[in-house]
C-alpha cells in the first residue's frame, strides 16, 4: 500500500470494517481513510490525572479511582444499577440504566475501579450517570491516559472506542501512504505540514494543554481551519464562475409599467429603495444572470423593490416567479402584487402545497401557457410538474430558510432555450458581514438602509409572566381608550403546528374571558389559507382589537394601527426572529411597544439576548449580537437548510481570518484550478458543495 494516496484507500481495508460497519460510517460521510482523518474531534477529555472525589464539582468531567463499597439493582420506576466507590476523601455513586449481569459481577465489593464521566450533584452527594469505567488490576498505581482523549462526532451504532481504534490505523497508514498537499508552496511554507497537523489533533502530545485546543489557535488547528475556509470560499467562487458562463436574457431599460406603478402609489420610494432598484436594473440589463442579495431591515420596503424588478421582466413579455418560505407570507405577497399589478393588466398566479385537484391544474396550465406573468408561491413552485413559459426572473424571499440547493433548483428549472433566469434574493434578517462574506460570497449584495418616513422606533420591555394580569390590563387600555390594535404571539419549543395551534387556542380562550369587551381574532398554521386570510383582513381593516397568533405572523403583515405586541416565552426564539415579530408594530406614526413576557427564572444567555432587543432597534446590530450568542449555524438556519456546517472552522471565532482567506481563495481560483477543485472535494461532501 506504500505510496498510495489516502483518498483512494477505502475504509473497508481497515481491520474491523466489514459491510455493516462500512454502511454505518457512510452515514456520517466517511468512505475513505482520508475522510476518516478529516473527521476531527469535536472536543477533548482530560483523563491524564485523578480528581479526589471530595473536590468534584457539578458539570466537571473527571477521572476518579476508588474501591467498590457496594453495588445494587433497584426496581423502582425504572430498572437501575448503582455502585458506590470511595477514594478515602469522599463517596461517588455511579448509576447505570443499561447494564447486564457481567457488569454487576465486575463491580464486586472491594474491587478497585477507574471511572470517567460528568460529575452531578445527587441525593447522596456526588454521582456520575453511565460513566466509562475500567476495573483495575492489583497494581498500586492506576493506568491513566498519557494524552488528551479525542471525542468524535458519531452516529447510532458507532462507539467512540471504535472511531479511536480506526483512527489509530489511519494514522499508521499516514506513515506509509500520502495525503495530497493542496496549498500552493508559497502558502504552505512556514506552516505545519498536513500530516503533522492531523497527528496532533487526533492524538495530542502529552505536552499539549486542553486550553490551547479549546482556543482554536494551535498551529495544527490553524492549518486545517485555513484549508476548510478556503474550500468553502473556493466552492462559492466556482458557483459564481459557473453562473458567469451561463447566458441570461438582457432586459434593457423600459420604464412604462414602472412609472405607472409609482404614479399609483400614495407614497414616494425612499432614496435607498431607488438606489437598490437601480443596482438591480443594471444587473438585469446584462447578458449574464443577476445573482443579487437584497438585505433590508424589517419594514424597509423590500417588497416594492421586488415588484419594480418584476415589472422590468414583465414589460419584456417574460414571467417572474416569487418563492416565499411559508404559505401565509406567499399569500400576503400574492395579495400585494395583485393590488399593484392587476390595475396594470398583469395576471398574478398563486401556487402552494395545499392547492389540490382542478384548481392546481388550472393554475399550472395558466403558467405553462404564459397567461400568468407573475407567479407567487412556496417551494411548490419548483416541483417537476410546474412548467414555465419564459421565466426571466426568480425572486426568493427569506433566503436562509431555503438554502443554496433549493435556490439553485429553481434557477435550473427556469432555464429555457439556453437562457437562465436572473435571481434576486431578499432577506429581512440582516446578515453580519462575517457571514455574508462566507455563506453568500456568490452573491452581489444591496442593502436598503433607510426606513420610510413616519416610522417610530418600538420601545421594548421584558416582564415576567407573574405580571400577566398587568399586561392584560395594558392591552385593554390600548385597545379601548387609545383606539389601537394589538398582537399576542404564542411560541412553543416544539416545531409542531398542532401543539402551536393548541397553545394559541388556549390563550385565545383565556383572553376572551379576561377581555370580553374586545373583539379578539385567532390565526395559526393549521387554519385553511382562506380562514387565515379572512382573519388577517378583518384585523387589517380594524374590525378586531386583538389578534392572537403563532409565529406565522413573523413576516409580511402590515397593519399601521397596531402599536402593541406581547410575545410569550420570548426566550424560546432567536433574536432575529424576535426582531422580525417586533417589526409588525411601529409601522405608523404612533409610539409602539413590544412586551417580552418571559417565564422566570431566565438563564444568563436568555437575559443577555432579551437585553439586546431592549437596547436596539437596528437589525444589523441585533444580527451581530445573535451571531455572538448563538453561533453561525443557528443564525444562518443551516441546521434545516443544508448549507455547510464546518468541521474545524468556527465563523465567529475565526472571523479575523476571513479577509485573508478570501484573498488567498481568489489567488488559488485563478492560478491553481486543479488544487481549488481538490480542496473543495476534500472538505465538502457533495451535498454541501455550492457549485453546480
What are these model-predicted stretches?
Residues 1-14, 23-26, 232, 242:
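Long, highly charged, low-complexity intrinsically disordered interaction regions
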Residues 42-62:
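Short boundary/loop segments of OB/S1/cold-shock single-stranded nucleic-acid-binding domains
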Residues 58-79, 117:
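Structural detector for short beta-strands of small beta-barrel domains
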Residues 74-264, 638, 671:
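Upstream accessory/linker segments immediately N-terminal to the RecA-like ATPase cores of bacterial MutS
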Residues 267-290, 304:
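N-terminal pre-P-loop "Q-motif" helix
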Residues 275, 289-611, 667, 671-675, ...:
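Inter-lobe coupling/hinge segments of SF2-like helicase ATPases
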Residues 589, 601-692:
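C-terminal accessory region of SF2 helicases/translocases
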